[in-house]
Amino acid sequence: MKILLSNDDGVGAKGIAVLYQALMQIAEVTLVAPDRNCSGASNSLTLLNPLRATKLENGFISVNGTPTDCVHLGVNQLVDEMPDLVVAGINHGANLGDDTLYSGTVAAATEGRHLGLPAIAVSLCSHHGEHFETAAAVTISIIKGLASHPLPKDQIININVPDIPLSELKGVQVTRLGARHKAETMTKQTDPWGRDIYWYGSLGTESDAGEGTDFHAINNGYASVTPLSVDMTANESIKAVGEWLADLEINRAG
């Protein structure tokens, strides 16, 4: 098996190093990651500047771009053979609920799927994580399961793992995305030159963390596995929207 590994925390992050060592036990791994922390980059691309890839002494490849850039460049230019799987992580911090809209980790996996490859994103639910080995073990187990249960072509898997020893993990649960309340108000400060600067507030608290959600699984000692659809069409609304569109004046003209 050949795996392309990336992340959004940067090529020097602990999470990706731990996952690389674990994946090397089951596959050939090419690591292509941003040269800096790109948390919150979502699916952004570098379009107005050239990308540069630098091979480091440890064999990892550092790119002056986003997580999506790394996967796109890796698949199209930096590997000798097409990977069998794209893996993104281990992220330093949860990607639960609507976090997934902003996550560079989830975006890296999504780019793999856009390129026609199976893809998974994995996160450890602590920004100061200690038990990356737990997330790595869960990832290996999921990859082995995917070998006989492949994902549909328009889906990826989003894995979140509590920051606990593997011996304390209760298991793995399939979940749906929960939700958070809106983030706290932005903070306004003044820089040394007297100019206004702004900081994002803390993440919102859980607003939908009931049974069956990714939040609920994590809060109860389980790893969460959420299938995500790359096609964001709200199919259940097509008929209703079509009906009121038909009544618009622009559709009645002539």
UniProtKB/Swiss-Prot annotation:
SUPFAM superfamilies: SurE-like. InterPro entries: SurE, SurE-like_Pase/nucleotidase, SurE-like_sf. GO terms for molecular function: 3'-nucleotidase activity; 5'-nucleotidase activity; exopolyphosphatase activity; metal ion binding; nucleotide binding. Its EC number is 3.1.3.5. Binds 1 divalent metal cation per subunit. Belongs to the SurE nucleotidase family. This is 5'-nucleotidase SurE. It comes from Pseudoalteromonas translucida (strain TAC 125). The lineage of its organism: Bacteria, Pseudomonadati, Pseudomonadota, Gammaproteobacteria, Alteromonadales. The gene is surE.
